[in-house]
């Protein structure tokens, strides 16, 4: 079963009518993943023992539908590695809240997708389990850190997948792979069972080829959770109710900082075309400014690395994961961490440890926290007079494998247009705008809204999807 032309609704219809059984769907999905993954390496683990839930109720849209999970989200009894050597053999004994909710909705968890190690990266090249390839061009990166989930959806291995987004890790790979991806409001979806990178920024979200499929999945995974104190108890609306609407009268802000000369010409043209589409259909377009955008990258890397250095202290080679051979306890700690973590993870641990040190805390971490407040205030001000903010997801389309992995500054700057949404805790998504005329690769259109206003994000994304029908295009890298 290849899902390039399938949706959750179409699968639900086939299962309900008996055109395909849930058991056969699982078998066909696994067979297709094995075949396709020889090219793209989207999965770290495929659950070959996966079985659909018993007594399926097809009033549940996800009943019997195979879903992929990013490998930093805990799955009970199914290996969860965070794409790291230090967790290469970790098999959890409990379930993350989002996976428990998917199973309660009778979805089938089909496997765990590749990612940058501990979600630290923008290309899925830091994985201990090898690079993932972009289905549109196998010589290009799929983006990161949720590159495996994005490639799995774009290649038709699954109809939807969960990802996580700390600074753009759902939206950038969604953009690079020509699919939809949404990072909900911080606190909209439980992080219980998400392997922490930066706890004040991390958020689980959804990736799918079609906007409605992500809305269906978010309907299931969103909402309160007693085990996560940061989750909001606000009522979760039916996100599909925001689909099928026009954009007449919608107030759309376009930050001038997001349309600078740093944006590739091919990206700019596709984004501008979507803005003009909104204008032509009655949206009110307002040019605005996010004046602290120039500070977001250093601010983010100080805060995120500081939180990461604390979160990753728990990996010591004693309780679980990789343990190096050593002569004494001190050597176990030292060798297990130095051998178990990759270079990028160690780089961020060192940066974070320095920023939190007594001599640097006030100068770096405290200052970054203050700038974060200013970034949040920039967004609050714009949302006083606007419903959504739009622009590019990335300044460029998918770049060549191995072309930026050794240039940390260039790699870190890949997040310059996505980080702010995490800083402000607002919902943000990428929807395909088209193909760049200069590179022939997909371009993502970013949509942001105020906190807990995912509805406007879905409304605009769905309108663009219905207008350009990008989902009808097939990734060129899959052609034999």
Swiss-Prot record:
SUPFAM superfamilies: Amidase signature (AS) enzymes. Heterotrimer of A, B and C subunits. Gene3D superfamilies: Amidase signature (AS) domain. It holds the Pfam family Amidase. The keyword Translocase does not apply. The active site is at residues 70, 145, 169. It comes from Lactobacillus delbrueckii subsp. bulgaricus (strain ATCC 11842 / DSM 20081 / BCRC 10696 / JCM 1002 / NBRC 13953 / NCIMB 11778 / NCTC 12712 / WDCM 00102 / Lb 14). InterPro entries: Amidase, Amidase_CS, Amidase_dom, AS_sf, GatA. Belongs to the amidase family. GatA subfamily. It comes from the Bacteria. GO terms for molecular function: ATP binding; glutaminyl-tRNA synthase (glutamine-hydrolyzing) activity. This is Glutamyl-tRNA(Gln) amidotransferase subunit A. GO terms for biological process: translation. GO terms for cellular component: glutamyl-tRNA(Gln) amidotransferase complex. Allows the formation of correctly charged Gln-tRNA(Gln) through the transamidation of misacylated Glu-tRNA(Gln) in organisms which lack glutaminyl-tRNA synthetase. The reaction takes place in the presence of glutamine and ATP through an activated gamma-phospho-Glu-tRNA(Gln). Its EC number is 6.3.5.7. HAMAP family: GatA. Keywords: ATP-binding, Ligase, Nucleotide-binding, Protein biosynthesis. It catalyses: L-glutamyl-tRNA(Gln) + L-glutamine + ATP + H2O = L-glutaminyl-tRNA(Gln) + L-glutamate + ADP + phosphate + H(+). PROSITE patterns: AMIDASES.
